[in-house]
């Protein structure tokens, strides 16, 4: 009984074990995931690259040389494309934007290049004898000085006395202030270069464009403050037209905010940080220099002419700018309200004039038709707001200007003949906040001087990204490859240098072909960069502008990006494919998300961020897999002639077989002749004379055959003899016959043995298949019985449980029904 019980328990355990094993096999039989390469996925990352310019240069002055050199830019696209990215949130930071740094460098380079061919005014650093040239009541006394000086002519030992008009701001007295001897203001601190007489300073809109392989992201949030996430993002190839206006305190001729005034600052609570105010409505400012000046040229030497103011004709009036008081006061009130929202509610906002510093910072400086104006803005920021008429800003004009792009450099601008008028739009303000302990009042003052803030006010909504068209993701598709066991050794050679493998043998060097291809491309890229640097260093000799250099760089960058992507696709065996399967299994440690979760719920940007830490590992595995595949294909091609047995029956192969057979037979016959001759020679040397080849040799008879002939004739006791073959052909035929018989017997034995082995193997294989079939049927029946038993057991348990539940419910029902009876019985008992 105990044995039977144990046997039954073991049977149940065996059934459950088989069931568990089947479930495990089904789970393991799930499809594996493999790495698949995709080309052209919408993925990007932040990058810094060389931007080039586009401009409508032909729409502006053609004769005058414009300092912005926009004639070297590419034409603007008449139909610019802007693609809006849905459900994309991107971070922007206008204070750490490489586009600002690049534009700043470009404008500096343009100014420097425009001044290179112009005249150095070092010979003018001489003593000037000056007198007051203005007597008009509207002009400050001494604003212009009539100066005479001695100048060396072409003949060095002769001097010529000349005279010219200078602004008082451009000269300083030598010695005491009452002296009539002056010098140019920058002679002891910096070199002075005269701007070319035909330079046009009017700003021309410049569009910055990204080269192929890169894109510019644009933030379209109307209240975007310049930093943080932006939810309304689009991609463009070029920015809008940006006028490179060099000004301080007031931003001129820029773009306007679309929805209310916007305050932008890197840290508004830090009073050392500049505050950029972006207006939503422009304020017009009209500036004029009414003097009707004339210009004269002073010959300094061969090919050198100094242009100065010759005379002032007519009424001399001060240069000035006019602004509508009502419009300006309304704008200032809106700015106050916007600034107040960034501080506690009880804080009062107050404006005041500049606190001091260089003339370029304390005044609103800008260029108007070639003349540099310096206007006093204290009337704009006096915080009274009582002037609703026209606000007039008094302005000064300087011809010797401190260059904003570097310290210790100055520029002399040639005087412009006639009246000068320019109309501009104020689109922004540059402010700074006072420090101090006053918690209820915040004072803001105009400032400027850092031209990066001017460019930043226009480039705040842009950023450059690099497009990453290569992406990898798991799929169920696997590349069909030539399978071969992968060797672990030899991968260390992947880290050898490009030229370091030149002395390796071909088998070892073939492993590093991938590395060599990559290093070859990087060498080309490095060489192109070196060439561009050499061109940039010699651009003054090649007469190339900064835009020409940038166009060269953009073209090279586009080729480099394309070659880089195509190189990777070629290394992975995916050339010319948009979707390329591999035989690299997907590792769940890279991402344990299911395929449906990846493809249905994630964007390519989210997916790339998730696997970005493993991208290099995946790329390396794909590369190693492709290298192994190419080695396998090479070894397979070496055995290509054995791939098809039908080639053996080709007529050309048969002729080759016959040729080999004839050579073998001829060799055997030749060897037989050689050995026969050697045997005869050996016997002759021993003194033996060979008998005729007709000699009969005895042939013994068998015991079952009588001697003599069958008729009983012939001599008894005599042995039979056989004839030796005679002649060369008979000898060759005898050898060939013996060779064929020998080959036939051994080939027959080999075929019989092989047939016996094959028959035995097939018989055993058939028996094994029958055994497996019986085993499969047995276990199928066992699984079926186990399932039936499990179903029956479950049914019994469910039935018993149901019966018990019904019984409990019946008892509860009877108890409820018997309640009135019990009450009645209790009442009767109580009455008795």
From Swiss-Prot:
Quick one: where's region V5?
438-447
Q: Where is this region: Disordered?
A: 695-717
V2: annotated segments:
147-187
Q: Annotated Gene Ontology MF terms?
A: structural molecule activity
List every stretch annotated MPER: 638-659
Q: Region entry Immunosuppression: which residue ranges?
A: 550-568
InterPro entries cross-referenced by the UniProt entry: Gp120_core_sf (IPR036377), Gp160 (IPR037527), GP41-like (IPR000328), HIV1_Gp120 (IPR000777)
Has keyword Transferase? no
GO cellular component assignments = host cell endosome membrane; host cell plasma membrane; membrane; viral envelope; virion membrane
- Pfam families linked: GP120, GP41
**Region CD4-binding loop, annotated ranges:** 354-364
Marked site positions, Cleavage: 487-488
Q: Where is this region: Fusion peptide?
A: 488-508
Residues with a covalently attached lipid (S-palmitoyl cysteine)? 740
Q: PTM comment for this protein? A: Highly glycosylated by host. The high number of glycan on the protein is reffered to as 'glycan shield' because it contributes to hide protein sequence from adaptive immune system.
* Gene3D superfamilies recorded: 1.10.287.210, Human immunodeficiency virus 1, Gp160, envelope glycoprotein (2.170.40.20), Single helix bin (1.20.5.490)
List the SUPFAM superfamilies: gp120 core, Virus ectodomain
Q: Which UniProt keywords apply?
A: AIDS, Apoptosis, Clathrin-mediated endocytosis of virus by host, Cleavage on pair of basic residues, Coiled coil, Disulfide bond, Fusion of virus membrane with host endosomal membrane, Fusion of virus membrane with host membrane, Glycoprotein, Host cell membrane, Host endosome, Host membrane, Host-virus interaction, Lipoprotein, Membrane, Palmitate, Signal, Transmembrane, Transmembrane helix, Viral attachment to host cell, Viral envelope protein, Viral immunoevasion, Viral penetration into host cytoplasm, Virion, Virus endocytosis by host, Virus entry into host cell
Q: What positions does the record give for the motif labelled Di-leucine internalization motif?
A: 831-832
Where do the coiled-coil regions begin and end? Answer: 609-643
Q: Where are the transmembrane segments?
A: 661-681
Q: Which residues lie on this side of the membrane: Extracellular?
A: 32-660
Q: Domain notes, please?
A: Some of the most genetically diverse regions of the viral genome are present in Env. They are called variable regions 1 through 5 (V1 through V5). Coreceptor usage of gp120 is determined mainly by the primary structure of the third variable region (V3) in the outer domain of gp120. The sequence of V3 determines which coreceptor, CCR5 and/or CXCR4 (corresponding to R5/macrophage, X4/T cell and R5X4/T cell and macrophage tropism), is used to trigger the fusion potential of the Env complex, and hence which cells the virus can infect. Binding to CCR5 involves a region adjacent in addition to V3. The membrane proximal external region (MPER) present in gp41 is a tryptophan-rich region recognized by the antibodies 2F5, Z13, and 4E10. MPER seems to play a role in fusion.
Q: What else is known?
A: Inhibitors targeting HIV-1 viral envelope proteins are used as antiretroviral drugs. Attachment of virions to the cell surface via non-specific interactions and CD4 binding can be blocked by inhibitors that include cyanovirin-N, cyclotriazadisulfonamide analogs, PRO 2000, TNX 355 and PRO 542. In addition, BMS 806 can block CD4-induced conformational changes. Env interactions with the coreceptor molecules can be targeted by CCR5 antagonists including SCH-D, maraviroc (UK 427857) and aplaviroc (GW 873140), and the CXCR4 antagonist AMD 070.
Q: What is this protein called?
A: Envelope glycoprotein gp160
